[in-house]
Every structure is written in C-alpha cells, then in structure tokens.
Design a protein with these regions (language model features):
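Contiguous, small/hydrophobic- and glycine-enriched helical/loop subdomains that border
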Residues: 79-125
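Active-site- and interface-proximal helix/loop "cap" or "latch" segments in soluble metabolic
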Residues: 187, 280-327
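Residues forming anionic-ligand binding surfaces in small-molecule and nucleic-acid pockets
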Residues: 72-91, 172-191
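A contiguous pocket-lining binding segment that forms or flanks enzyme active sites
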Residues: 130-167
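Active-site cofactor/substrate anionic-group-binding motifs, chiefly glycine-
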Residues: 49-75
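Well-ordered alpha/beta subsegment
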Residues: 102-121, 188, 192-205, 212, ...
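Active-site loop/lid in soluble adenylation, ligation, and acyl-transfer enzymes
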Residues: 1-50, 54, 66, 139, ...
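Short beta-strand elements
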Residues: 138-139, 152-154, 270, 277-295
Length: 327
C-alpha cells in the first residue's frame, strides 16, 4: 500500500489527488494540507443552495464540489487531510458501514490520544472530545474504489465557516456560529496555542502514517508519479469546471445544517392558507431543543413549547399539516 505524504499543496491538488488515485483504481493513503483556504461541498449538494456565493467571490474563496458525501465545509492550512483510497473488494471494505467508519477513524482517534486529547468515535462517522466535534469526514465510491476522507484539526475558523454558509438572515448565521463555537473543538483549544503551535506538520503526518499503518498494513512512501499527475490534470478539467461545480439540483424549501454528530439547525418554510410560515428549530439526536415560528397567524396544533423535547418527526408533521387544502 502506498503512502503519499504530500505536505502543503495547492487547494486544487488537495482534492484532485485522491479523486485521481481512485479513478486510476490505485490504493493508498494521502496526507496533505491546502496552501490556500477554500470551500468544499458534498457530491449531493448544490453550492447555490448551501453557500453564500457572493461572499465567497468577494473573499476570493474557490468552491469545489467533491465526489464524496458530507456537507459544506470551510478548509484551510490549519487542517491536515487524511484520504484513504481502497478497492471495493479490499478485505477492509467488506464490513458494514458503521464498522468500516469505526475501523478507519481509530487511527485518527489514536493520533489525538497520543497528543493527550481524549478523543473518541461519535457515531457514526465523527470524532469528538466529550461530544465536541474535532474532525470532519466524508465517504463515497469513486470508480472501482471506496474513498474515506477527513481532517486533523489544529484549529477551526468558526467565523469563516459561518460567513460562507447561505443563511436566511444574520440571526441564523450568528446562531450557527455560536453553536459551532460551543460544540466544536481543536488541538489549539484542547492543548493550548503554544503547545499546538510547537507541533510541526511533519510530526503530525508521521503520527497519522503510523496509526493508519496499524490498520492498513505497511505503507510504502510514494511520490506523485507521471501517471497520477496526468490523471489529476484530466480529473481537474472536469471537476474544476463551472458545469461540474455549480450543477443545479431541485430547490429545497426545508434545510438542516449539521453542527456535530446528532446536532442540527433547521430552517423550514411552509405554505399555509394565511401565507408562508417560517420555522426555525434546533434538534439533538432527533429531539427538538428549541423552536420558533414566524408568519401570519403562525400556529401549530399544540403550543410551540410543547414540541420541545419531542421528536423532530412530530414537529415536521405538524408543520406540513399547515399546507393549504388542494380541494
């Protein structure tokens, strides 16, 4: 199995390398970090629905739509990427989904613990410190390969992430940022700025390579050879094009944004006989934490407060029942 320890690379190469490796049907582990900040969205997402594209343009932030799942995320040099590419028929892939995630998140947890951070796997594919998220991940199938990617977070810019998010108004954006600041953590937060800064990228890459080798077997250092570079150029011509990046999907009236495992912010628009009703609510593990309604005589079958602690399903059914009759 090859180890591609690329270090600091262009933002484009930080995504194109693992896509190209998978399209070639080659296996390996890639370790890298982007030289410039950018925003990445998941395969099933449309940037126009997820991001404030005007803000991204003003800030000079490129947008990349990847071929693996997960949500929109702000990425920069303070995050070290690990990218696993395996053939679909590899023995390590023949597991149920949760077992696969747990197996390949174990090395990331191992690195954090080696640094004195009490991290663990938060079902099904997050890494957390006492429920505070400390790594993002995404997975998918590319060509004949399964790809699992994620990061080791030195620090995370919650303000920058909140600004790139498409939000109905500043209040929603502020709420999202406040939740992130409470519910996300990083090496900087856990170890302190001085201790985190004393860790070199090379040291962290070395820890990642060592921990992943305990799962993947011997990892032989390899470089970006000519075949892989040519594949990156081919993949780049497609994936860096506006046609790929900004592919449109059916507009969604209802939206939820992930903060960490189990914790979501929801924005729901519902037509009613009196006019459009807007609902905002926060959920934890499928239960409503808080909810507010806006709109003409917006009223649910029960008092709004009675939905707190109940299931998200009950609340959304009540909202859907506001729809005008088709008779």
């Amino acid at each position: 199995m090859h180890l591609y320890r690329l270090g600091r690379v262009s933002w484009q190469d930080s995504q194109l390398a693992y896509h190209a490796l998978a399209h070639l049907g080659r296996q390996g582990l890639i370790l890298c970090s982007p030289a410039e900040p950018y925003v990445s969205v998941g395969y099933f997402q449309e940037p126009a629905q997820e991001l404030d594209l005007e803000h991204c343009r003003r800030q000079g932030l490129p947008v990349f739509r990847r071929e693996v799942g997960g949500g929109a995320v702000y990425l920069d040099q303070h995050q070290l990427f690990w990218q696993v590419v395996l053939k679909r028929d590899h023995p390590l892939v023949s597991l149920n989904r949760e077992a696969f995630y747990r197996r390949f998140l174990a090395p990331v947890v191992g690195v954090y613990r080696a640094l004195g951070v009490g991290a663990g796997v938060a079902p099904i594919n997050d890494v957390a410190v006492e429920r505070r998220r400390i790594a993002g991940t995404g997975a998918g199938e590319i060509g004949d390969c399964v790809v699992f990617v994620g990061n080791l977070m030195r620090r995370f810019d919650c303000a920058a992430m909140a600004q790139v998010l498409r939000a109905p108004d500043p209040e929603f954006r502020r709420s999202y940022q406040q939740y992130m600041e409470r519910e996300l953590t990083s090496l900087r937060h856990e170890l302190g700025d001085q201790q985190q800064a004393a860790l070199s990228d090379d040291e962290l890459y070395g820890l990642l390579a060592h921990e992943f080798a305990s799962v993947m077997g011997s990892l032989v250092p390899h470089h970006l050879d000519d075949e892989l570079r040519r594949a990156m150029e081919r993949v780049g011509r497609r994936m860096l094009s506006p046609a790929w990046t900004y592919q449109t999907r059916r507009a969604r009236l209802h939206r939820k944004v992930k903060v960490r495992a189990g914790l979501y912010l929801h924005h729901w628009l519902q037509e009613s006989p009196q006019g459009p009703v807007e609902a905002r609510f926060t959920s934890l593990d499928g239960k409503v934490l808080e909810v507010s309604l806006r709109g003409p005589v917006a009223k649910l079958p029960r008092e709004t407060s009675e939905y707190i602690g109940g299931s998200v399903t009950d609340l959304t059914k009540a909202l859907s029942a506001m729809a005008p009759s088709r008779d």
